[in-house]
């Protein structure tokens, strides 16, 4: 046998791996236990699962107030954002899906399947486009700060934004008071503050106050000695001693005005003015290129670093720098803050026009009535514009005013003056009673209320001479038959009703023209 294997060595070498594989196969089959029968075990497990499903179906039929699992916000992954706990969260889908593009842009799309009640096609048969394709700008520091100095809230109120720290206020007065806090030189300063003393012994951290009430509260709290047991809310009515000079006061209510600002305190430092003058700056309104407004103080103020991300604030600072004289408009203040000096800022502030102009009341004496001079037939004609511009009429001189023309009807004053000569006569009432000679020269005399009279004076009526007689009582009596006839004719009811209707129609047209009505 060995001799035979030597004759065919390659053949026997190839058969060795097969023999080794057969050996290990027999070894494994003898050592490992055979597979058990698990059919009975599977049948029991399936039965328990079916019982669990039946119980779950029964639980689903009964409504529950709280869900079985916690609601987790997976809005960025396509889940729902805010879901009430009493809703079934298993069937809900978000109507908007948000994804992040490789360019770091947030992209939002509307899911058509999640919109309830939406029809896939319109009445025309064209498909509805549900994707918006709206992309927002990349995230930047400017997104965290407001870009406008004023913005309108949902309720219509305007919100004001501080130019120096982006703080928001709903009332402009609060913004004005807040801007004073950014000023380097405060409006009020404690006269007893000493920066050379240690910080623990100072009366205040800086000694400056932007508001007068806090300034007075500081002086009463730190520089007045009160009796023991006096509460802070009762200090104004309490007595006390000045902590600097020792002077006694029965009440501390007017301590600042009567003792400090008046200069009566003997402990005041040298060079201290008797009255602490207010040194707060004024506000200037600046409009940027996009139409927004910014309020800037004229005093030196500190600007927070985060405001530099606001483009409106940077543009407002540029406007201040271009319209100010000096090189120290913007300078470094401290480690990470800037100082804006707008003291020399020049801007043209338009004056506000008053909505309501107060009319000057004219004082009219009851005894004297001012009337123009008498115009005779030979006098030159006076234009109505010259009369209205050169003469100041009193409330009793309404007969000298021109009537208002109407498009639909003529006024009663226009009906009376048909001749050009009647319009140019200005009559002095004193000449009618005192000057008899003038009556004979110029018989065309009109009554003082000629424009208010409701009858038409013809030339024949005015050409009749006036006869005067002297009575025993030294009074002048006038007898004119023609005028008496005209006075009787004006009492005609038909003529009076026509004039009344004409005047009513004129007033109605005037009312409709001014108020836009259609009566």
From Swiss-Prot:
SUPFAM superfamilies attached to this UniProt entry: beta-beta-alpha zinc fingers
Domain of life assignment: Eukaryota
ZnF (C2H2-type) residues: 160-182, 188-223, 240-265
II: annotated span: 65-97
Disulfide bond entries: none
UniProt feature, compositional bias: Low complexity: 131-146
Variant or mutagenesis effect after changing residue 66 to A: In STP1-102; prevents proteolytic processing. Activates transcription also in its unprocessed form
Other information: Present with 1310 molecules/cell in log phase SD medium.
UniProt domain comment: The N-terminal inhibitory domain contains conserved sequence elements important for cytoplasmic retention (Region I) and proteolytic processing (Region II) of the protein. Region I is also required for ASI1/2/3-mediated negative regulation of transcription.
Subunit structure, as described in the record: Interacts (via Region II) with SSY5; protease component of the SPS-sensor.
Protein name (record): Transcription factor STP1
Species annotation: Saccharomyces cerevisiae (strain ATCC 204508 / S288c)
Gene (UniProt): STP1
């Amino acid at each position: 046998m060995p001799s035979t294997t030597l004759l065919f060595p390659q053949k026997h070498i190839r058969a060795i791996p097969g023999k080794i594989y057969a050996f290990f196969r027999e070894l494994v089959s003898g050592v490992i236990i055979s597979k058990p029968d698990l059919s009975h075990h599977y049948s029991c497990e399936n039965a328990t699962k079916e019982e669990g499903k039946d119980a779950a179906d029964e639980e689903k039929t009964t409504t529950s107030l709280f869900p079985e699992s916690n609601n987790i916000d997976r809005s960025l992954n396509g889940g729902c954002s805010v879901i009430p706990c009493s809703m079934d969260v298993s069937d809900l889908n978000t109507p908007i899906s948000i994804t992040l593009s490789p360019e770091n842009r947030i992209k939002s799309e509307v899911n058509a399947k999640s919109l309830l009640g939406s029809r896939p096609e319109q009445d025309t048969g064209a498909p509805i486009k549900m994707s918006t394709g709206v992309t927002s700008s990349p995230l930047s520091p400017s997104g965290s700060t407001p870009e406008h100095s004023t913005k309108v809230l949902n309720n219509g109120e305007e919100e004001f934004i501080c130019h120096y720290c982006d703080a928001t206020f709903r009332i402009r007065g609060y913004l004005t008071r807040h801007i004073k806090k950014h000023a380097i030189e405060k409006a009020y300063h404690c006269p007893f503050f000493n920066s050379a003393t240690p910080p623990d012994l100072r009366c205040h951290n800086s000694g400056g106050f932007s508001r007068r009430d806090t300034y007075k509260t500081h002086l009463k709290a730190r520089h007045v000695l009160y009796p023991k047991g006096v509460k802070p809310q009762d200090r104004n009515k309490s007595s006390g001693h000045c902590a600097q000079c020792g002077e006694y006061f029965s009440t501390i209510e007017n301590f600042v005005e009567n003792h400090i600002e008046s200069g009566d305190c003997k402990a005041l430092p040298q060079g201290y003015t008797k009255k602490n003058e207010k040194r707060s700056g004024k506000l200037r309104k600046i409009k940027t290129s996009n139409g927004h407004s910014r309020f800037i103080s004229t005093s030196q103020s500190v600007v927070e670093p985060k405001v530099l991300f606001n483009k409106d604030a940077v543009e407002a600072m540029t406007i201040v720098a271009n319209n100010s004289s000096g090189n120290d408009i913007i300078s470094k203040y401290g480690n990470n803050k800037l100082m804006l000096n707008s003291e020399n800022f020049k801007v043209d502030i338009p004056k506000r026009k008053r909505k309501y102009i107060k009319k000057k009341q004219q004082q009219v004496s009851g005894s004297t009535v001012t009337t123009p001079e008498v115009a005779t037939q030979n006098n030159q004609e006076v234009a109505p514009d010259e009369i209205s511009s050169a003469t100041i009429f009193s409330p009793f001189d309404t007969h000298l005013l021109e009537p208002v023309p109407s498009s639909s009807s003529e006024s009663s004053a226009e009906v009376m003056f048909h001749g050009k000569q009647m319009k140019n006569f200005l009559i002095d009432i004193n000449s009618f009673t005192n000057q008899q000679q003038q009556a004979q020269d110029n018989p065309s005399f009109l009554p003082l209320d000629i424009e208010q009279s409701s009858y038409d004076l013809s030339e024949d009526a005015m050409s009749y001479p006036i006869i005067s007689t002297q009575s025993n009582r030294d009074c002048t009596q006038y007898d004119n038959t023609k005028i008496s006839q005209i006075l009787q004719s004006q009492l005609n009811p038909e003529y009076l009703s026509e004039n009344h209707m004409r005047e009513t129609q004129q007033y109605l047209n005037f009312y409709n023209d001014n108020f836009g009505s259609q009566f």
